[in-house]
Structures are given as C-alpha cells and as structure tokens.
C-alpha cells in the first residue's frame, strides 16, 4: 500500500527522476513557463518552490545549496539574484499550474507551469 507516500515516482528510477526535475527547473528558470504533463508539473512545483524559498535568504550558503541541486551556474544566479527577490514578501505559491489539453499520442493530461 502506498498510503501517505511523499512524492510521485513518475515511473522512473531515483537518479532519472532527480535529473528530470533538475532539467525541468532549469527550463522553467530560463523560459518562465513550460508545458509538461500534469504529474510532472505537480512534482516540479514542490521542487521549484523549495528552491525559491531557500534562495530567499540570499546568503552564500543558500547559493551553494541551490547550485548543488541544479548544477547550472546561470540558472542558480538567475534564481538567487532575480527570481527570489521578486517573491521576498510572499510565503510560497510562486508557481501556477494551468491544465491545457490531452496529448494526442497517448492522451496524457498536459499542463503549463509558470512563475506567478
């Protein structure tokens, strides 16, 4: 039974899932909004909001922690210097998920995740 299980497996190994969330986070940072499947968007929301909350402190240790999670210097700098200060007065809810369509090939529910 999977009662109270804390995250979605997304039918991937743990390393693959970590790489997926990292790559989606980098894309969201660069573009501001991306289209993906609904379960991926819901899992990404949790991951990305933790990044922004951590970056809100603005100290060097937060910068290092975010770089450790993303391994992408440009995205790390963007989150710490541009995105996090914009949400300094906000307690969570940095992203929005909008359900869009059913994908033609496999009828998967698609969604747009964007920064508020």
From Swiss-Prot:
Keywords: Ribonucleoprotein, Ribosomal protein
GO cellular component, one term: cytosolic large ribosomal subunit
Transmembrane segments: none
Gene3D superfamilies in alphabetical order: Ribosomal protein L17 (3.90.1030.10)
Biological processes per GO annotation: translation
Recorded GO MF terms: structural constituent of ribosome
Domain of life: Bacteria
NCBIfam families, per the entry: L17 (TIGR00059)
Complex formation: Part of the 50S ribosomal subunit. Contacts protein L32.
Family assignment from sequence similarity: Belongs to the bacterial ribosomal protein bL17 family.
UniProt-listed PANTHER family: LARGE RIBOSOMAL SUBUNIT PROTEIN BL17M, RIBOSOMAL PROTEIN L17
Name of the featured protein: Large ribosomal subunit protein bL17
Species name: Sulfurovum sp. (strain NBC37-1)
């Amino acid at each position: 039974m999977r009662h109270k299980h804390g995250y979605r497996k997304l039918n991937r190994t743990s390393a693959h899932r970590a790489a997926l969330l990292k790559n989606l986070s980098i894309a969201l940072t660069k573009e501001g909004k991306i289209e993906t499947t609904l379960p991926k968007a819901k899992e990404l929301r949790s991951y990305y909001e933790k990044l922004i909350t951590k970056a809100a402190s603005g100290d060097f240790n937060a910068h290092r922690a975010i770089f450790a999670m993303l391994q992408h210097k440009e995205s790390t700098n963007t989150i710490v210097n541009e995105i996090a200060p914009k949400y300094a007065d906000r307690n969570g809810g940095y992203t929005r998920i909008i359900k869009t369509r059913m994908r033609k090939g496999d009828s998967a529910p698609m969604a747009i995740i964007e920064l508020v």
